[in-house]
């Protein structure tokens, strides 16, 4: 179900957006073995799922890709978004990609392409998922219980969300993707760029270096601020550092 393949083991917009994942693991003392286990378990769970099979997920990815490439502007919402900041982001051609709980800042879902999440976004993520919104579910070593509980709940909804699966390991896992990045926010940027959206058509709002955003969901403030340093590096290396509040 998974194999080493340096030529196809990631789809990150730049090699470093992928390679930095090893640096993050080393910095926090995390094991790639745990990340692999979580990703493979998620893949196996959904292999023959009636709503989220590999073929259905591929169709979802193609639909989101088409939506993003057709947008005049793709706005990525970070957890520090203030609702009044959205006033200037309501043009007909605007499409949103929300980082986890930041989806709660949106007044509705009509312009939402997807939510990129490792599933700690709490009530706002759950509300969107239970209304059939698309979620790019990320597996890592510390969220097995979260994704298991979330998917168990969502599959019982009258209109379950559509899913795309991502991981952060140095291996190919069939039916999953490594788009690069680390936090939900910078991974959302990596996701959008990896699908071929031109950088000039992408804007970030609600990205902060020194503030744990109100939409962050379940988090430990001290750890989150450390993670934001990595977010800043990834976003800056991709050429979007000027969007980060400092």
Model-found features: residue ranges?
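Glycine-rich loop/turn
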Residues: 82, 92
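Phenylalanine-focused residue identity feature
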Residues: 18, 28, 96, 124, ...
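N-terminal donor/sugar-recognition subdomains of glycan-related enzymes
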Residues: 1-74, 83-87, 212-246
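Acidic/Gly/His-enriched mid-domain segments of enzyme catalytic cores or analogous surface patches
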Residues: 52-55, 66-71, 93-95, 101-197
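A generic "cationic amphipathic patch" detector
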Residues: 128, 148, 205, 215-217, ...
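Glycine-rich anion-binding loop/nest that anchors nucleotide
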Residues: 76-81, 100, 181-185, 193, ...
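A structural signal for short, well-ordered beta-strand segments and their strand-loop junctions
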Residues: 164-165, 201-206, 243-246
